[in-house]
Swiss-Prot record:
One of its GO terms (biological process) is cell-cell signaling. It comes from Homo sapiens (Human). Coiled coil: none annotated. GO terms for molecular function: gap junction channel activity. Highly abundant in skeletal muscle. Also detected in testis. InterPro entries: Connexin, Connexin_CCC, Connexin_CS, Connexin_N, Connexin_N_sf. One gap junction consists of a cluster of closely packed pairs of transmembrane channels, the connexons, through which materials of low MW diffuse from one cell to a neighboring cell. This is Gap junction alpha-9 protein.
Amino acid sequence: MGDWNLLGDTLEEVHIHSTMIGKIWLTILFIFRMLVLGVAAEDVWNDEQSGFICNTEQPGCRNVCYDQAFPISLIRYWVLQVIFVSSPSLVYMGHALYRLRVLEEERQRMKAQLRVELEEVEFEMPRDRRRLEQELCQLEKRKLNKAPLRGTLLCTYVIHIFTRSVVEVGFMIGQYLLYGFHLEPLFKCHGHPCPNIIDCFVSRPTEKTIFLLFMQSIATISLFLNILEIFHLGFKKIKRGLWGKYKLKKEHNEFHANKAKQNVAKYQSTSANSLKRLPSAPDYNLLVEKQTHTAVYPSLNSSSVFQPNPDNHSVNDEKCILDEQETVLSNEISTLSTSCSHFQHISSNNNKDTHKIFGKELNGNQLMEKRETEGKDSKRNYYSRGHRSIPGVAIDGENNMRQSPQTVFSLPANCDWKPRWLRATWGSSTEHENRGSPPKGNLKGQFRKGTVRTLPPSQGDSQSLDIPNTADSLGGLSFEPGLVRTCNNPVCPPNHVVSLTNNLIGRRVPTDLQI
């Protein structure tokens, strides 16, 4: 039985490196084979030769008949079966121990490497030091009691299952050929040196038959476990391969999904930052107000409503706002052009080639050249402010004079304009007209072509204005040609529309007339 103990200790190591079905197989091998052979089978088969009795006195005949009846002792046959069936497991155990030792050496080498890295890491790097300590603790806890069943070790395990299954089948076939499934109590033998057919009797044949069937059943169960373990490993291998492909595909899909989410989040953050940097366009009233103040105070800095922004989107917004302003300006120009056409029709009968400024004749060509020069200078100053202002707004004369009394109006050269509140007439030739009657039909004292006059402030609907015709009065007037713009074009262009300014008020001489 000492040999059984050595074999049992060796198979215990195999038990550690086996699968669940392999452990069941080893349990059956230990309990139902080795234990039965060691405890009960020897007692049953101990009197096998002594209890074999033959009806002859011929020397040697009983031994020849016993050899024919029991060519091999079943107890020894079963011992050989256990040894041969366990031998592939011993080979697998040797390979598993070798792999375990290799893994342990690799673990020790990694531990030594981590300790060296941990010693080299400075205390100023706590994150790296903590990471190395965690890896070292994991290596300490990762001490393997058995080698993982993968790679070449898995191949060895499958081969050893096939081998012991083949051995099991061989011993089962051999036992059947030798003894069958039933042991007869009477055995007839003939042969030399027996003179004739000799009858021999087997001791305890029923008990031996039971043991025979029991050992054959244990062998069948072991074979079934071997086949089941092969299917288990194959199914596990296939499942692992399919799961690996599914997991790889899932990780691939998750990677692309996360990448798409990151791109969307990055695009949203970029769009949000761009929207934060975009300046909001002011409304129309605020824009007109800012540009009006800019025209009134030209010495101040230009409005910063549309100052260039480092972001590229601000340029597009500025262009959009300027387009909107130009659209509004075009509408206003159309309205004013209609009014100018009406006044041009009224004053078409009084057109002349000369311009009269308070009784003084000026050459028309010189005045046109002067106006063009002033218009170019004003355009240059106008576009150099970094933004575009609305050149003019259609303003009702009466309402405008009530809102801003200190305003100088610049009319086109070919547009004679007379406010409704102005009851008086202009020029020395119209002083004898009725001052109380409002203009009806044809305007009295209409502006001549190219005539520009400064409008006095209105004191009421019934109040009129008398402009003396003397030279002193004419000489006392201070006229600002740079601030008054006229147009000689039949269709009033945008740059000759009404402009608002207070420069005249700031530079007025005592003799100037106020509006």
